[in-house]
Amino acid sequence: MKAEILCVGTELLLGDIVNTNAQYISKELANIGIEVYHHSVIGDNENRLLKELERAFNYCDLVITTGGLGPTKDDLTKESVAKFFQEDLVLHEKSLKQIEKRLLCFNKSMTESNKKQAYFPKNCEILENPNGTAPGFIIEKDNKIAIILPGPPYEMQPMFENKVIPYLEKLTNCTIKSKVLRITGIGESDVADLISDILESQTNPTVAPYAKQGETTLRITAKANSEEKALNLIVPIEKEIRQILGDNIYSSGETSLEEVIASILVKRNLTIATAESCTGGLLAGKLINFPGISSVFLEGAITYSNESKINRLNVKKETLEKYTAVSKEVALEMAEGIAKSSGTNIGISTTGVAGPGGGTYDKPIGLVYIGLYINGKTFVKELNYSGNRQFIRNITVTRALDFLRRNLE
């Protein structure tokens, strides 16, 4: 089965709202083995929407739309889909009562505009929306399936998970399970080379690598006639991949790198403080995303100038003069200085040239040092990257977290 995701809303085209719906739906469809053929974004215009539906169904069996189900005149998705399938819109009394009840929760009364949200194509399956006033629906006709969902993610995602996925799993006539392995420290091409034999010989399960900034994910997907059999198919492939990639795999599922590290720190009761120059607080910000980190994260210092490194972290003036701020020697003194002044088990530091200016022949843009102090032991890592300022800062944070992880495990 091939699918297209069609996100409706002029606000998406104008860039006022980030289109997270397409990303979420693509990921969920991949989990159940449905190929996403195309993504589209279109404004609130009936003629364009009809043309887009016509084009999409020339290539796909399934079109999933989000947005355009609101109460205003420019919310036209439902009307356009009904016209495409040559269906009349009829009032659904149960939905009308649910919308009215929902409005009462906000001390609002039913209006004619809201009543519009209770009209649906005559022959469709209605998807209740306990989180808003816009129910979705599924319509099947002439070997075409359209799944129409509300735009707000907090309404769309529960509806997709609770209603759409069970519906689609029945259509595929088999159980599909996936396991995601998260990898950092090596790039996507290196991962692909290392597991090339697995990638070239894959049938069921399939193994698909995906890259994003600073890490790679591997999705192992198996099909079988039961959940147990599908999961059993994944086990030997996962084991083989883990043997090849080793500690480059930092987690599975949705667990992020900072969550892995924060869990280790909390579990072992290891306190930590950060001293940042080029990353400007991004490293501390990643760590404090984790609930409960306050028990071990004591302090974060942004020491951008040489004076602040000397006064706050006790970096020696002679070290700065001899080696400059961007050096392994200064990175180590920063890490040790923040740990000792904060009274923590661990100190971690970043110093480098993020650009766009400031680079020299000896200290080019993209040169970064990560310093690490753990209970009296010190470690340092040199990085060299090309890219813009934001990329260099973000990749430094990822590499710093990974450097810490590897020295804790």
Swiss-Prot record:
InterPro entries linked to this entry: CinA, CinA-like_C, CinA_C, CinA_KH, Competence-induced_CinA, MoaB/Mog-like_dom_sf, MoaB/Mog_dom
Domain of life: Bacteria
A Pfam family hit: CinA
Alphabetized CDD domains for the sequence: cinA
SUPFAM superfamilies: CinA-like, Molybdenum cofactor biosynthesis proteins
NCBIfam families registered for this protein in UniProt: cinA_nterm (TIGR00200), molyb_syn (TIGR00177), PncC_domain (TIGR00199), PRK00549.1 (NF001813)
Annotated family: Belongs to the CinA family.
Name recorded for this polypeptide: Putative competence-damage inducible protein
Name of encoding gene: cinA
